[in-house]
């Protein structure tokens, strides 16, 4: 005869999953072996656990509503519940019995209640100047921290965890399901102890027995000089605290260097465009340019400098990360041609143009040869 799982929990057949769980928790608190010792209470606790398992599983509940019992022999049995064994269906089912031992085959055992914490990734952005000098960044993290009330134990008192009555400490519920191969055993984590095989009889009211709570935490991250965009800084033990007060994971800070208005970075080198008057480019000169640090750096412009020429200033680039030395500053020449000429300047420029008119043009329309390269090219054509 099928068991009355609804009657065991004291709920009607139309009860919601929330009502079923609420009724189960009420009975579990009443009949838990640590609270109510004795064989009769232990049996009622086991009955309530199995009823909860059945009625919170949609497939099993459907079988109950159709008048069946999913926990009868061959229909599945939870450790510590009513059923047990594979039953005798013969055929391929017996072969699976031989491999799985007719009971606890494939068991992984309970997992530890104390688990290591997860790593945390935090992204932050800095200026190019901060990447050059190094910086300290104040960060506020929303993370899992150790519960200060129970210090990670999860218990509100000195009582130690007790063996879970649902799975008898196995940490998992084993079930037998029918398939075209016969009876196949499956297992899943125990819903009562969450797979740990033990429960806390008096859970901490602050963390609900988890040993950790969510909180905001302030930390200071040291950004080393020379860091590049996309690099990560590892801060050991600064991630999330694990369940049961387990060791914290690591914190990884991913750094993004914001674009600069003047300088462009390429590895350890810096690139910048400098405006050079055409007179200085022709005659050569020395100019003072401002570096990334704000200091004046002297740059030599050779005579005859052309547009887009690159002048290298050794050691004026970014510091090398965790190494000696700096990269270079690559100054790209942007030739500046004045547009508002006074009469004297215009007169001098015209004089220069007339003086160099014999070789200033590289190409002249008409049949007349325009320079040395034209003459050389025409020689090869003959």
UniProtKB/Swiss-Prot annotation:
Cellular compartments annotated: Cytoplasm
One GO process term, biological-process aspect: protein refolding
Q: Which residues bind Zn(2+) 2?
A: 164, 167, 190, 193
Q: InterPro entries of this UniProt entry?
A: DnaJ (IPR012724), DnaJ_C (IPR002939), DnaJ_domain (IPR001623), HSP40/DnaJ_pept-bd (IPR008971), HSP_DnaJ_Cys-rich_dom (IPR001305), HSP_DnaJ_Cys-rich_dom_sf (IPR036410), J_dom_sf (IPR036869)
Q: Which residues form the J domain?
A: 4-68
**Metal-binding among keywords:** yes
According to its record, what are the GO cellular component terms? cytoplasm
- Cite the binding residues for Zn(2+) 1: 147, 150, 204, 207
Alphabetically, the GO molecular function entries are: ATP binding; heat shock protein binding; unfolded protein binding; zinc ion binding
Q: Using the record for this protein, list the coiled-coil segments as residue ranges, or answer none.
A: none
The domain of life is Bacteria
Keywords from the UniProt entry: Chaperone, Cytoplasm, DNA replication, Metal-binding, Repeat, Stress response, Zinc, Zinc-finger
What binding details are noted for the cofactor? Binds 2 Zn(2+) ions per monomer.
Main localization is cytoplasm
* Co-factor(s): Zn(2+)
Cross-referenced SMART domains, in alphabetical order?
DnaJ
CR-type ZnF: 134-216
| Binding partners and assembly | Homodimer.
Q: What is known of its domains?
A: The J domain is necessary and sufficient to stimulate DnaK ATPase activity. Zinc center 1 plays an important role in the autonomous, DnaK-independent chaperone activity of DnaJ. Zinc center 2 is essential for interaction with DnaK and for DnaJ activity.
Q: Which family does it belong to?
A: Belongs to the DnaJ family.
Which function does this protein serve?
Answer: Participates actively in the response to hyperosmotic and heat shock by preventing the aggregation of stress-denatured proteins and by disaggregating proteins, also in an autonomous, DnaK-independent fashion. Unfolded proteins bind initially to DnaJ; upon interaction with the DnaJ-bound protein, DnaK hydrolyzes its bound ATP, resulting in the formation of a stable complex. GrpE releases ADP from DnaK; ATP binding to DnaK triggers the release of the substrate protein, thus completing the reaction cycle.
What name goes with this protein? Chaperone protein DnaJ 1
Source organism per UniProt = Corynebacterium glutamicum (strain ATCC 13032 / DSM 20300 / JCM 1318 / BCRC 11384 / CCUG 27702 / LMG 3730 / NBRC 12168 / NCIMB 10025 / NRRL B-2784 / 534)
């Amino acid at each position: 005869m099928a068991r009355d799982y609804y009657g065991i929990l004291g709920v009607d057949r139309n009860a919601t999953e929330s009502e079923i769980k609420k009724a189960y928790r009420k009975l579990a608190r009443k009949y838990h072996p640590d609270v109510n010792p004795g064989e009769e209470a232990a049996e009622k606790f086991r009955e309530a656990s199995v009823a909860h398992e059945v009625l919170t599983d949609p497939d099993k509940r459907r079988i109950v509503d159709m008048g069946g019992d999913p926990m009868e022999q061959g229909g599945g049995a939870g450790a510590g519940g009513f059923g047990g064994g594979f039953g005798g269906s013969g055929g391929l089912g017996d072969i699976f019995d031989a491999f799985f031992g007719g009971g606890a085959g494939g068991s992984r055992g309970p997992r530890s209640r104390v688990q290591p914490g997860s790593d945390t990734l935090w992204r932050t952005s800095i200026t190019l100047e901060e990447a050059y000098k190094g910086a300290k960044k104040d960060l506020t993290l929303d993370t899992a921290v150790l519960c200060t009330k129970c210090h990670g134990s999860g218990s509100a008192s000195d009582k130690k965890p007790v063996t879970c009555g649902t799975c008898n400490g196995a940490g998992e519920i084993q079930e037998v399901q029918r398939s075209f191969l016969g009876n196949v055993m499956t297992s899943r984590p125990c819903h009562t102890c969450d797979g740990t095989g033990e429960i806390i009889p008096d859970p901490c009211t602050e963390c609900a027995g988890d040993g950790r709570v969510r909180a905001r935490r302030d930390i200071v991250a040291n950004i080393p000089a020379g860091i590049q965009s996309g690099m990560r800084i590892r801060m050991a033990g600064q991630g999330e605290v694990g369940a049961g007060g387990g060791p914290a994971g690591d914190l990884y800070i991913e750094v993004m260097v914001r674009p600069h208005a003047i300088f462009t970075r390429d590895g350890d080198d810096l690139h910048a465009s400098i405006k050079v008057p055409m007179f200085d480019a022709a005659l050569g000169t020395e100019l003072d340019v401002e570096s990334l640090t704000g200091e004046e750096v002297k740059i030599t412009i050779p005579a005859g400098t052309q547009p887009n020429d690159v002048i290298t200033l050794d050691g004026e680039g970014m510091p090398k990360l965790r190494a000696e030395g700096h990269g270079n500053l690559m100054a790209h020449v942007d030739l500046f041609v004045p547009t508002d000429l006074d009469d004297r300047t215009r007169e001098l420029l015209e004089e220069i143009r007339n003086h160099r008119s014999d070789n200033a043009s590289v190409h002249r329309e008409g049949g007349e040869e325009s320079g040395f390269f034209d003459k050389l090219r025409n020689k090869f054509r003959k």
